[in-house]
């Protein structure tokens, strides 16, 4: 039996639309991510467990884990009879890389079960392909950090899909999921087809400056450059209370905040534990909309997807 855990991730990070993402893990030790188990069997089967299992498609072939198994078999050119179990701990349409968690855990578990016939680059390419079936287009800003860990910059040149960018140990990521769903496809459809020249220049300046600040170890500058002129001005209308929440967390002391992925999760970066706790308390009382919502104080997950049992 192989059991693989794949962590949540926060894509875009305001400054890097479709090209930046960070894997995150709660500081209290909770597992914020999906778990997939693979066991040898006579025929294929898939069982769904976990807090959000009831939100998965009722038709098994529509389940992305089934599609991962099917695509992996096609890649190897043979049917692999296994019993798969998906522990769905991540809310769907949350902006926390929920589909990436399932895809990464499923493909990594299949690869481990079969003795690692695929290298990490090929496996990551498959992960992007499968996740793209849900989001509507291939982009790696969730699957890359989820699989490899840390903060990842998408490269997609010279057979390199992504490379790690150094983060800051003092940063605490407060993630608040309000309990509503925002479809990635819907959130992409709301974006304009063309952008003004000054917005393109500002975006390039912010992203280049952010990467420079990370490598030159300037956390204050990096946080200051986490601005979004590409997606947030258009997507915030999908997120009730988002603008007020951003203003509130800034007043409390967050050094940066924005939409995690395509939302509705809000991320707030803090550089002190007491500030992070006050931000988390405010968001828990004011940004969550129902019982399915939650707030976690996290750090970068530098390990990425990992085998829990083998």
From Swiss-Prot:
It catalyses: L-homoserine + ATP = O-phospho-L-homoserine + ADP + H(+). InterPro entries: GHMP_kinase_C_dom, GHMP_kinase_C_sf, GHMP_kinase_N_dom, GHMP_knse_ATP-bd_CS, Homoserine_kinase, Ribosomal_Su5_D2-typ_SF, Ribsml_uS5_D2-typ_fold_subgr. PANTHER family: HOMOSERINE KINASE, HOMOSERINE/4-DIPHOSPHOCYTIDYL-2-C-METHYL-D-ERYTHRITOL KINASE. Keywords: Amino-acid biosynthesis, ATP-binding, Cytoplasm, Kinase, Nucleotide-binding, Threonine biosynthesis, Transferase. Pathway: Amino-acid biosynthesis; L-threonine biosynthesis; L-threonine from L-aspartate: step 4/5. Its EC number is 2.7.1.39. Catalyzes the ATP-dependent phosphorylation of L-homoserine to L-homoserine phosphate. The lineage of its organism: Bacteria, Pseudomonadati, Pseudomonadota, Gammaproteobacteria, Enterobacterales. The gene is thrB. Pfam families: GHMP_kinases_C, GHMP_kinases_N. Belongs to the GHMP kinase family. Homoserine kinase subfamily. It is found in: Cytoplasm. The keyword Nucleotide-binding applies. One of its GO terms (molecular function) is ATP binding. NCBIfam families: PRK01212.1-4, thrB. One of its GO terms (cellular component) is cytoplasm. This is Homoserine kinase. ATP binds at residues 91-101. GO terms for biological process: threonine biosynthetic process. Its main location: cytoplasm. It comes from Shigella sonnei (strain Ss046).
